[in-house]
From Swiss-Prot:
<keyword id="KW-0460">Magnesium</keyword>
<dbReference type="GO" id="GO:0000287">
    <property type="term" value="F:magnesium ion binding"/>
</dbReference>
<dbReference type="InterPro" id="IPR006073">
    <property type="entry name" value="GTP-bd"/>
</dbReference>
<feature type="binding site">
    <location>
        <begin position="314"/>
        <end position="316"/>
    </location>
    <ligand>
        <name>GTP</name>
    </ligand>
</feature>
<dbReference type="GO" id="GO:0042254">
    <property type="term" value="P:ribosome biogenesis"/>
</dbReference>
<feature type="binding site">
    <location>
        <begin position="283"/>
        <end position="286"/>
    </location>
    <ligand>
        <name>GTP</name>
    </ligand>
</feature>
<feature type="domain" description="OBG-type G">
    <location>
        <begin position="160"/>
        <end position="333"/>
    </location>
</feature>
<dbReference type="Pfam" id="PF01926">
    <property type="entry name" value="MMR_HSR1"/>
</dbReference>
<keyword id="KW-0547">Nucleotide-binding</keyword>
<dbReference type="Pfam" id="PF01018">
    <property type="entry name" value="GTP1_OBG"/>
</dbReference>
<feature type="binding site">
    <location>
        <position position="173"/>
    </location>
    <ligand>
        <name>Mg(2+)</name>
    </ligand>
</feature>
<keyword id="KW-0378">Hydrolase</keyword>
<comment type="subunit">
    <text>Monomer.</text>
</comment>
<dbReference type="InterPro" id="IPR014100">
    <property type="entry name" value="GTP-bd_Obg/CgtA"/>
</dbReference>
<protein>
    <recommendedName>
        <fullName>GTPase Obg</fullName>
        <ecNumber>3.6.5.-</ecNumber>
    </recommendedName>
</protein>
<dbReference type="InterPro" id="IPR027417">
    <property type="entry name" value="P-loop_NTPase"/>
</dbReference>
<feature type="domain" description="Obg">
    <location>
        <begin position="1"/>
        <end position="159"/>
    </location>
</feature>
Amino acid sequence: MKFVDEASVKIEAGDGGNGTVSFWREKFVAKGGPDGGDGGDGGDVYIQADENLNTLIDYRFQRFYNAERGENGRGGNCTGKRGKDMTMKVPVGTRAVDIHTNEIVAEVAEHGKKVMVGKGGWHGLGNTRFKSSVNRAPRQKTMGTKGEVRELRLELLLLADVGMLGLPNAGKSTFIRSVSAAKPKVADYPFTTLIPSLGVVSVVPEKSFVVADIPGLIEGAADGAGLGIRFLKHLERCRVLLHMIDILPIDGSDPIQNALTIIDELEQYSEKVAQKPRWLVFNKVDLMPEEEADEKIQEIVEALGWEGEYFKISAVNKIGTKDLCFKLGEFMENLPREVEAIEEEEKVNFMWDDYHKDAMAGKNVVTEDDDDWDDWDDEEDDGHVIYVRD
């Protein structure tokens, strides 16, 4: 199945049903009181995480999703039926972003989590709502409001513990092949990896972690060069980043400048991602004598001013890879998982939140003209008489 991690859709929540103007009629009661019911609320649109899905490919073919409209109110104080909701099933780790405002509308990182992305319209109010001591025969009602319409960009963020980044041909895919059962494509030309891939690394029985390999970055990726930085979003939920550095690039480029390029592109993309724990991994140490490799690595570390963890490996010959995986397992076991706090100020505002308050204050009210009722006398309304057999 083709891996699709981004799709654009248009969602439309259901319109609210209209309120109605109606009066109670019965034998011997020529002119009863108001009994117009409210309309039904429009259906909402949700996204729900489903662990059985792993791609957004379905949303490439069907781009429009809408919930049901609420029914109109009826006489006899009958309220209209609420419109059915529309639930869009998406892979775990999907977020919905408003295309026009770039606002993150929803994010589902757990199986079964369900979040509203489009609010249905409010129901209109029937004329019963406007009855008062000075208005015994109200002809006012309110119309149901339109459901919310949004254009969303669905983005799938892979849920991995370790994220790998580096220039093309640095050896990221080779490393994943050597430490897991994943088999990403490996070749001696740039951009062999075109889509992200995941590998599960088992350190000890019943303990494992997931490594994400993303396509390589080049200078200017933040401006769209190469494959751009669209795949860097997959690193946002990673707990540790491995920066793979080729100490002997096949094109003769400077490893120090290559490392600085990756760091610069990462910082341009997101300060939050750049602040994550990051380890340097020097690959292809078997291509030169050990002493020469150590000198080269020390030169790079000093040039970068690096004070964190760094490792020497040969991914193709599996030199140092086992030790690196054990260190990663120990580090993540002691590293608390990030818990994203939902702040009140970041709550998404939907339309029509104050609609009913405005309606009861006299705004958005529709008055129906009906001359047949203009001469209705309050004194003729004796109430609803119920006859009971003895």
